[in-house]
Structures are given as structure tokens and as C-alpha cells.
Amino acid sequence: MKPEAHGGDRLRMAALAGRAPDSLLDFSVNVRPEGAPEFLRLALCRALDHISAYPSPHAEEAMEAAARVYGLPADCFVFGNGTNELIHLLARVLKEDGTPCAAVIEPAFSEYALACGLAGLEVRHPDCGVRRDGDSDEDMLRQLLSLLADIPARAAVWLANPGNPSGSFLPPASCRRLLEARPDLLWIIDEAFAAYAGPDDISSLITQLPDNAVLLRSLTKFHAVPGVRLGYMVTRAERARRWRRQLPAWSVNAFALAAAQAVLADTSDFADRTRDENRRRREHLCACLRDVPGITVFPSLANYVLFRCEQAPADLYARLLREYGIAVRDCSNYRGMKDGSWFRAAVRLEEDHQRLADALRGILHPAASVPPRPRSRRPALMLQGTSSDAGKSILAAAFCRILRQDGYDVAPFKAQNMSLNSGVTALGEEMGRAQIVQAQAARIDPEALMNPVLLKPHSETGSQVIVLGKPVGHMQAREYFRYKAGLWQTVRDAYDTLADRHEVMVLEGAGSPGEVNLKQHDIVNMRMAAHAQASVLLVGDIDRGGVYASLLGTWMTLEQQERSLLAGWLVNKFRGDASFLEPAHAYVRQATGIPVLGVTPWLRNINIPDEDMAGFPWSQAADTTPPPPGILDIAVVMPRHVSNFTDMTPLAAEPDVRLRAVRRAEDWGQPHVVILPGTKSVAADLAALRADGLAELICRHAARDGWLLGICGGLQMLGRAILDPLGLESAAPSVPGLGLMDLESTFAADKTLVSVRRAATPLPVMTGGYEIHHGHTSHGPSALPLFVREGQGAPEERICGYVSGRRWATYLHGLFDDDAFRRAWLDHVRQDVGLKPQGRQLVRCDLEASLDRLADVVRQNVDMKAIYKRLGL
């Protein structure tokens, strides 16, 4: 028997498969697929601070921690460099103590017999066989006692519980009966996988340790850190003290010692969650395997399953590796399983189980087999960020356009968007404005599947929730977190539907995947990346400072499985010579193994709407000084819950306009034009404008017959009254407006969602846009129609704006996106206030041209070859 005959030998398996080790789907090693829990990874990270000192000689801190947990003397515990070291220690001391023989209950972990053989002990192999469905604990007890009838007194018995490779389990009460029936034997019970069978009180003998027992326990199997090498044994104190002296000092290193203390001190729900998760996944794995004709699956309570293919070809193990890149545990080195038909598979993710079942079906039943499922999903690139406004949205649009330019049918996707900037599709669906722009970059029609969940905040803790383009209600944060659990399937279905129709997907995350307080409820960042099997680019905003600390800090919060999705870092919004950043890039790569794939510059003169409030170009402190000669001064009053502020972005690009954000009365200045934009909370924001003194300034401006434009919520504020009979936005059924226009608005449950291709205006040009608002507005005789939509229906039904002299109000978002209308309106206002009209377009807010320029800049500054290679394109 060879010592290396175990699962998890990645280099050997990769050589046989002819593949890179990281490309293998490994069922041969029984490790939680997500990797180590967060608390344990953090403990290992902290241990770095102690590697300059020797650890305690015999892991005394871990002994004390175990004693506190189990209520046993610390001297009862012996810690070692993995249970494998302790197995060999036991074999040696058993030989020294004159143990007549060692009985290894087969089939069993090969290391027991190997260690005893190396120590010179006689080894016997009573074969218990494999437990089947229907076999009772009583049957197993009788069989074991019968098999051990001729084992002499003072012999040692090695028994794994749960069994390896079978996963069969004998409850502690039955184990005690077994030990009591043969008190003349030393029972070595290996509980390496017992944590999967239940908490210690129902899975382990440690809570009532028998005198003739030695327990072997692993701290790395359940917690997915086999590379740390950490295990311990428990027995009576006198025995443990004597055996501990046989171990060399410092066999438990600083990392293993830190891991031991972290695991033993853990009071979180990690263990319960892991058991529940493993049970569900194990049942799924069993079902997948049973679905393959000719495979027999045996019962297990561990995180692995034993199965048999009696008609398996002799090279089944090798073919799984070579043809499918799948490694299982070949059990032919176990006693009683030498015919090549026995295999063990670790519990992994459901999609992994299906891949294994499909591969087995393809080998065992090639003629009847359905074609294997695709080995991977559509190629998917995902932009995540170290923060909000890191540039994810604009870069996602850039990659959509680059992929489209290179001939790929690409679609954007963002699972959940929190934004007050939304738009309407041709089907009347509401979705995030950023995803609409990304769809335009991909040259496809936007649809709500691209942004299945949209949150539009209306207070500090509440939002309107829009699912698949339709509002489902207003929710507070806690209420939404409960509701959100049911949205994950909606999000996955939306993504899968889109991905089935396109060649490549470009996903966008939200905020940062490093927000540890939000991870549990994540549906938009790493959880979405895992579902899409996306290659993730993490974007950091260098203009804010601290970008490399942010990249490394985010990486530190990611779990092992999440880190495997990271393809590279992108440093965004850089001003200067990127070559000066090379030392930082080398450091980040050395620390993480992940390369910086691009440094994108601060983008100028590319007029593409941003998603986040922090991103618009006129968010800096208001300038109240008189504008330069010939410049039209436009003040945008900013309600606290401003929405669709991108309506004004095209104005900011005009060289003859100074666009100012006004949030306080002292920011007012002497504007030529005041714009009151949309808001998600009209009544509350109107009250705030009154409290801040801004409402009075708006009224004074109107009294001087100054130009005034209200958009959506701004339209409603300008009217006589805002009625809310259903209490949609406030408890008050009626709120007085500013009284500047003869309008009365009434909120209604149904939302108006209209895409307006063309609308007539009082100017010699038309415009277009979209409407998003609750309820309707009625007008008196002094408020005349301003904009009228083209199309069917009575003219009164198609009104989307009103005018009273220099006071304009409209429900039309995006009206300034039209270059001709924007210039006509600006020149109309300029002439009226005594400024010379330009008479020609100064700026083209041509989104197509802007997207092409954006793609060119990103392509020049990002390693597209590396990204395409990662995507398999």
C-alpha cells in the first residue's frame, strides 16, 4: 500500500488529464466547495503577525481552548500536524506498549494499516462490508462484535465514524455499547467527518469519553483547510501525557494554532448552516448519481458518497479525467473494493453534481446518452467595484460596445440597481438608465430582463421596488430584505433567459462586494458572478485616493470561491502617466496573484449619462458669482430625493451654459433659468424646500418673471396642489404646491410608463424622451399644452407638458438629449434674457459617437487580449 494513495493529488491528476490543475472539477477530496469560513480566514490572516515567534511546543493554547469547550482536562488533548501524524504516533506507541495486534475495520482509510505496518504491528482486516439502505444500527453492532470475536484482549481497533469511504454512521449510543461489549480492547475512533453527522452531542463520543477510547478529530475537513494540517486526539489524561512526549516540539505551526483556537471559539451558526447545506447537496448528488443506469449509491452522513458501477470500464477513472476534466476517488486501493467498480465523490455544488452525472452517463451509456450539458455558461464579463461610483456602469457600457465592435452579440445585465435614474423601454417597462445606455452600447433594445430589480429610494430607509419593469410596492429596508430572498430565482431566470439569447454577457455589480454586512443577502455581486460563472474585473477609483488599499481590502473580504472568479483589477479615473503606477501593480499582483489589466484615464468630453449622483459633472459646490459674459446661468434645485438628474447632463456639455447644483439658499446666486427636477418623494421634498428657504427663492424668481422649468416631480411642485388619496407618498391626502402654475396633480396606484418617440413643442423642432410618474395632472385655462405626444388618442390625452409664459413644466424625461431641441430651447431662452443666440449646434450629444469614443479609450488602456483569453473568446 502506497502512502500517496489518497484523493486530492492535483498534480498527478492534472498530468493524467492533460489539463491545468485549476481546471479540474475535483470530487476526490472531501472539502467544502466554498472553502474556509470567513472567521477562520481572518484568524489565519492575523496569524501572520506571529510568524516571527516560535509557536507553543505542544499547542498548549489549543489544548486549553478544547478543554473549555468540552469540559475535559487540557491534558486529555494531543494536537498534531494533522490527524495523519497522530495516526502514525498511535501506531508507534501501540507497538511500544506491547499491543498484540491492530484490527482495522474495513473498508477503511488506508493510513491506519500503513502506519501500523510501518510500526511493526500485526494488522488484521475484519471486513464489515458496506452498509446499505435498510441496515440497522443493531445489525451493524452484531456484525462488528462477531468480526472481532477472535481479536485478543489489549488489541487496538481502528474504526472510522462516519466510515471512509462509505460515509455510514453509528450513533454515539451504539458506539458506547460496542466499547462496553469489548472493554478489553483499545478503540481508536476516527471522527474526522463526524461534524457532518450532527453537533457533538449527537455525533461524537467526546461528550462522554469512554476510558477505553481514543478519539481522532480533524479541524480541517469540516472547515475546508486541509492545507493547514491540524488534528487532535482525545483520551484519558495519563495516556495523552505519555503519548504527547513522543511528538516533536512545535509540530503545530502558528497558522494551525490560530486555526485551532478560532474553530474551538466559534459560536456562529456556521456549523449548523454547513450541515444543512451539506445535507441538501448530498441528497442532490445521490439523486443525480441514481439517475444514471447501472450506478448504485450507498447511504452516507458525511460530505461524500460511495457509489458503484458494476459494468464500469477499467479506465473509467482515467476517462473522466481526460475527457471531462473530472476527478473522483478511485476506491480500488480499499480492501474489498479491488475490482475497479467502486468510487467515492465529494459533495459539491449542484451544477458540479450534474456535470459528474452527465459525464458518467456519457461513458457508461454512450449510445443512449443525451448530449452532455454545456460545460460552461455563456462567456460572461462582470464589472464590480471597490465602491459606488467607481466607474462600473460606464466601463460596462464600454465593454458592451467593444464586444459589439468585435462582432459579438452581447447583452448587459445588472441584477439589482438602486438608482433614481430610470428609463422606460418600448414595452413600457421601467429599468435603470445605466442598463438602457449599456443596451444601446450593445446595439440591442433595452428590456427589463437586463435589470430585473430596480430600487428607487424615497427616504433614508425606504424604496419603491420595481421587479421586471413593474412596481410591486414601497418597502422599508428590513421588509425588502425579507422580500429579497424570493427574488433570487427571478434574477437567475432573467439572466438565464438573456444569456440563452446572446453570445456574451456583460454584468455589472452594485456598490462593492466587500460590504460584509450585505453579503448574506447578496444577489448582485459575487453570488451573481458565481451563477453566471463570470470573469470579474474589480474596478477602483484612483481619483479618490487609496485605490490599491481598496483593491486589496476588497480582496481580503472575498471567500476562496469568490477569489477564483477574479480575472483582474482595473484602475479607473487616472490623471497622468500610468507607468508611475507599475510598482503598485507589481505589489498587488505579488500579494494576490491577480494582475492589473488596465488603467483607464479620467474621461473628458464623453457625454454618457452616469448612474450615481456622485458622477454628474456639476455636483461640485455651487458657484454663485456672476457668470462670464455670454454664458447662460442655469440653477438646478436639488431635492433630497432627486431622480433622473441625468435629464440635465446634455446641458452641462454646452460651452455657453453654466449648470449649477443648488442645495442651499446661499447657493442661489442670480440664475437666468431655474430647473426643478424630478424627485421620488414629492411631498417630503417640497416640505424640505420650504424649510430650507429654497421654495421662497423659487417663488421670487417666478415673480420676477424668470425662466422656470419643472420636470416630473418638479411639474407637480409648481402646481396648486398635490393630492395623495391613497397615501402613496405621504400620510397627508393633500399638500399645497408652490402655486406657480394652474395645475393639480393626483397620485394613483398605477404608474405611467411611456416611451415618447416624438413630441410637438412650441419651438420649430420636436423632441422625445419618456414618462415615468404616478397618477395624472389636470390643468386650468392659464396652463396651456406645452408638449404633445405624437400618436393615437385625443390631444388632451397626449399632453405631456404645460406652459404659462416663462414657466414650463413637463413629464418628459430626456427632452434635452435631442441636440436640435436643446439648442433651439437654449437660443430661445438666450434671446429672451438678452444674450445672443448661437444659431448653431455647439455640442453633439450623439450617444453613438460617444460610445465609440469611450470604447476606443478603454480598448487602448485595457489588456483586451488577456480578457478575451479569460472569456475563451
Residue ranges and their predicted role:
Residues 1-53, 153:
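N-terminal "arm"/small-domain region of PLP-dependent enzymes with the aminotransferase-like
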Residues 55, 60-101:
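Phosphate-binding glycine-rich loop
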Residues 93-155, 159:
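PLP-dependent aminotransferase-like
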Residues 130-197, 208:
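Active-site phosphate-binding strand-loop segment of PLP-dependent enzymes
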Residues 173, 323, 336-373:
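PLP-dependent enzyme catalytic core of the Aspartate aminotransferase-like
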Residues 212-291, 295-297:
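PLP-dependent aminotransferase class I/II
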Residues 278-279, 289-324, 347:
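Conserved PLP-binding catalytic core of the aspartate aminotransferase-like
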Residues 373-699, 707, 749, 759-771, ...:
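Flexible phosphate-sensing "switch/lid" loops adjacent to ATP/NTP-binding sites
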